[in-house]
């Protein structure tokens, strides 16, 4: 039986994140990245899905895309036995082909935990991927964490994070209340 994560007056029955969906320009390139670079397990494919009859607005009504958009195919990948990536390739008359930046509305990134950040960064460089800057050392509640962003071949942003000794927030008790008490005690001394 699944344990509900949230309290009353929130989404009933919510137990966690099921999958993350992303759209890519080339499914084979994405499959190579997810399987050969990240080590995901390929699960299965679906599609194509076409709704092109006059008056058929299923795609717009259900997915908020152009009514004539075609979902050419989608692949499912599992990472680390838990996270599922649902990866789409669309053809749409109004398709925007530039990935959003983090500062754009809808901008996003996927953060991946690694045990050895330096080894992971060296691996990404050896794979020919773009790593954005040098690893950053976090401060405050995230003290103990190092992180760096990198780009998938199609420009989607990913982040590597590592905090082998746990973050300060977690060492202080892992709740907002515990962190507030820790911060108050630190500033009082």
Predicted feature locations:
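Long, charged/polar, surface-exposed segments that mediate recognition or autoinhibition
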Residues: 101-103, 122
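A short, acidic/glycine-rich surface segment
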Residues: 4-6, 94-98
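Core segments of cupin and vicinal oxygen chelate
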Residues: 23-82, 119, 126, 138-139, ...
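Generic short beta-strand segments
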Residues: 47, 90-92, 135-136
């Amino acid at each position: 039986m699944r344990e509900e994560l949230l309290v009353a007056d929130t989404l009933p029955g919510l137990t966690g994140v099921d999958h993350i969906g992303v759209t890519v320009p080339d499914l084979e390139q994405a499959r190579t990245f997810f399987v050969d670079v990240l080590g995901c397990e390929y699960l299965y494919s679906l599609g194509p899905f076409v709704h092109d009859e006059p008056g058929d607005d299923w795609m717009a009504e259900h997915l908020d895309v152009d009514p004539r958009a075609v979902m050419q195919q989608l692949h499912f990948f599992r990472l680390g036995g838990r996270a599922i990536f649902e990866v789409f390739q669309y053809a749409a008359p109004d398709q925007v082909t530039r990935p959003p930046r983090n500062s754009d509305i809808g901008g996003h990134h996927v953060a991946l935990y690694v045990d050895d950040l330096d080894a992971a960064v060296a691996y990404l460089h050896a794979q020919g991927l773009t790593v954005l800057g040098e690893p950053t050392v976090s401060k405050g509640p995230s003290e103990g964490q190092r992180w760096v962003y990198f780009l998938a071949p199609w420009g989607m942003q990913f982040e590597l994070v590592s905090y082998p000794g746990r973050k300060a927030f977690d060492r202080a008790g892992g709740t907002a209340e515990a962190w507030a008490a820790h911060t108050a005690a630190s500033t009082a001394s």
